[in-house]
Amino acid sequence: MARCRHHSGYVADDEASHSMCSARVQLPKKPLVPEMGPASKLGHVPHPPSTCGSSALQNQRRNKRHPQPFSHFLDFLTESHVLDSLETVVEKATERMAAMKTEAGVPLVEVQDPVEVPSGGRRAHARPSLSTVHRHRVRPTLCTGHPNNYPSSSSSMSDSHSSLMAGWLGSHSRDSDLGAQGLGSLPPVKDRLLLEKNLKRLLQLERKGKGLSQSCSKRDSLLWDLLGSQTSFQWTQEQPLSWFSELLGSSSGVPEASEPRPGEQEPICKREFNKEIKSLLSQLESLDLPGYCPLREPHRTLNFLADHRLFPALQSVVNQAVDKLRGARCRDGRPLFPTSLEPPSELQVQRNLPPLGSEPAKPTNSGQPHPTVSSPKTPQRKHKDRGGSPSMSSAQVATRFKLKVTPMEKPDIPSPSLHSREKEPDSDPKLQNPPVSLSSRQRAQPWRGLHLTLPAPGIVVEVACGQGHLRVVTPPLACPYPHSSCYLLPELSPVTSSSPSSLCPEVTSSKVGPDMSLQEKGSLTHHS
């Protein structure tokens, strides 16, 4: 025989080493796998593995040639019963493919049964025979083998072979021809049933949420005691952590002042730890936590925090952390996060100003010119003067304003209203604009070129030149804008100048309503 078929029909790659093994293999009387085409290999019965895997023959094989990795891989597949499970999957797939039919009722694939078809002829049927189906049904689904599902390379090859051969020789085979020879490829029936029973038990425990059975807990407790007795002198020399004793919540926790013996404290910690684990595992049944969904998880978390009123607790924790950070100091005594270095904001400066309105000031750059659009209706508008201080009503949108003036010398103006209003913003050097290069004419008359900004909804008043003081002008009652505010317009002093611009100063005002934008440019008459 040129080649030796072994390991479930696979052809080995080492002919010389396996040819001597073929003489010792006792072949059955009836040929299990007839010589047929490749279609017959779908559901064929595997041969029993050869007995040439003993340690002596393996040593001879290693001495003659280097070990063949493929042959060792086949040995591993056979010894750990991986081939049986693979064949089961293939046979199930074959049955499903054989049961499929086309729309015309013709079987989709013609499958030949290798057991019932003789060697000379070929007979195709759409479904396997009853014996084949019965053989497939009794095939177990649990595969046993070495730990980690891989054969150890140290010293258990001969032991594994002897145990496997003992199981094969002592087991009852599923087929009549294999039963006559007393050979098989499965472990004993008792062991198989025991393994399946243990597997079902483990699955039930997983469904119920209990990770420890009675036998496992006893075994783990014994293992815990054994490890604790061996390593108690190593990790109990130091005192237990305070948070660990609080986590256990045991009243039997020994305080740090008293130094107990390592042997006394160890069983207490172990018992409390086991109690905590058991209580947590028993609570898993009543929790009934929903599955994690990344789309709904933020909403669920927020709802959970709101339902259990955890937001105040979290806020208190954050406040405590902020207070601690504020009170933290460096080694030299300075605060870690100083708050006095921050510059005073405009809102703090504006608190010293008289409350003229509700909205904060919005100063504009005096260097940028404002676009003006001439309107013929403005000269015809008549303004009525109001004596005394302005009394703003709640309906009017009164605004707070700032005067930004860059004089070269302190002027003498008899009007107290303008002097009092410009004195407070100028007291702060930060609010003053940087000095601008002035012409000789502006140096002679420093109060010309006054730029006044009213940060109401879009009101800008500019006085090009001229000496005077401010006066409050209210718009007429028939104004088309219901939310109009008071206009602060300059009133010229009796002191006149020879320039034509002083006789007719330009005043630019703009009013922006909710849906409209109007900018007006007009002229004021000179009061002599």
UniProtKB/Swiss-Prot annotation:
Record carries keyword Phosphoprotein = yes
Entry's localization field: Cytoplasm, Cytoskeleton, Microtubule organizing center, Centrosome
Modified residue Phosphoserine is at which positions?
Answer: 389
- Keywords in alphabetical order, please: Coiled coil, Cytoplasm, Cytoskeleton, Phosphoprotein
Where in this protein does the record put region Disordered? 43-68, 335-444, 497-528
- Taxonomic superkingdom: Eukaryota
> GO CC: one term?
centrosome
Coiled-coil positions are: 81-104
Q: Where is the signal peptide?
A: none
Which spans does this entry mark as compositional bias, Polar residues? 51-60, 363-378, 434-443
Quote the biased-composition stretches of kind Low complexity, using this chain's numbering: 497-510
* Comp. bias intervals (Basic and acidic residues): 419-429
Q: Which PANTHER family match?
A: COILED-COIL DOMAIN-CONTAINING PROTEIN 116 (PTHR36861:SF1)
- State what protein this is by name: Coiled-coil domain-containing protein 116
Q: What is the lineage of its organism?
A: Eukaryota, Metazoa, Chordata, Craniata, Vertebrata
Gene name of this polypeptide = CCDC116
